[in-house]
């Protein structure tokens, strides 16, 4: 079951990366009041937060996949860490992406709404973030 959890974590990471890229491209293209909205500091801060969360997720997913290759005894613990972190991050990035797109974020005109829906479904597959946080805590002795 842990290999499936690691695989869905990798898929979710890919979705989060693509949703982030779509959002950043939109911020660079969309103009409001004659100014690219990507120049607004509040949106830059939100994008920077998404970027840092994605970098953490990359490390978690790579570590979980490495555990399988190394046949480590830490597989369940590290996989739960990855699934919890990536689930929360995909949730965050899909929410932020739709917010930054405004009303068109949930229309068929832009794909960002599809990532929002996929994030919600993938988060529940093989245990949600809460399940994996609890599992991680149990496996580390808390």
Model-predicted regions and their roles:
Residues 2-142:
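Alpha-helical interface subdomain recognition
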